[in-house]
Every structure is written in structure tokens, then in C-alpha cells.
């Protein structure tokens, strides 16, 4: 199992940084969001996120599992079946992720406007 670069970031410091370490990054929040609706299998995540590599998906799920956010259920059958679901502890992050979703839906156009017409372009002139 891989180790995180920063297992316990700023342990005595910023709780926001600590939370972002758990659900931050390109894929963890997306994987988490899709597990809110229920269990997912590995290949379901591959269909949901076609640009994620198998290696990265495995690493992200392992990190979420190591943090106690995700439960990995292995069914001993042929072909092998593995399902991922949120733990009770993981569900405590659900309101945060749903609020992030709501913010994204409400502010996508504003952010895109800033990105296309905003400060970055003004500084390049």
C-alpha cells in the first residue's frame, strides 16, 4: 500500500488543511461524491471517471480506505467482486461535499467569466 506524502499535515494547525488532505486532490472528492448514492464497483468508477488511470484510482481508493472514509468489501466469488462504500465516519463529510457541489453549480458561470476575462488577462497586457 502506498503512503501519502503528508500523512498528518499540520497536525496541530489548520483544520481546513487537514480536511482537504482527506478529500482534496483531483479524484478523491469525485469518488466520494459518487459513493454518496451507494456502493460502487471499481469499473463503475472507471466509467464515471474515464480519464483516471487504473493505478491512480487504486491509490485514491486505498487512501480513502486508510483514512477510514471508505469501506472495501471483497466478495469471495468467481469472478471476484469488490464494492466500495462510505463508512459511517466517511458520511460525516457528506454535507461538506454536497455543499461544495451546490457552490460549484451556483458559481460555475461566475468563475468561468473570471477565468476568461479576469485578473490574469489584465496582468498579461
From Swiss-Prot:
<keyword id="KW-0805">Transcription regulation</keyword>
<keyword id="KW-0238">DNA-binding</keyword>
<dbReference type="InterPro" id="IPR036388">
    <property type="entry name" value="WH-like_DNA-bd_sf"/>
</dbReference>
<dbReference type="GO" id="GO:0003677">
    <property type="term" value="F:DNA binding"/>
</dbReference>
<dbReference type="InterPro" id="IPR036390">
    <property type="entry name" value="WH_DNA-bd_sf"/>
</dbReference>
<dbReference type="Pfam" id="PF01638">
    <property type="entry name" value="HxlR"/>
</dbReference>
<keyword id="KW-0804">Transcription</keyword>
<dbReference type="InterPro" id="IPR002577">
    <property type="entry name" value="HTH_HxlR"/>
</dbReference>
<feature type="domain" description="HTH hxlR-type">
    <location>
        <begin position="14"/>
        <end position="112"/>
    </location>
</feature>
<protein>
    <recommendedName>
        <fullName>Uncharacterized HTH-type transcriptional regulator YybR</fullName>
    </recommendedName>
</protein>
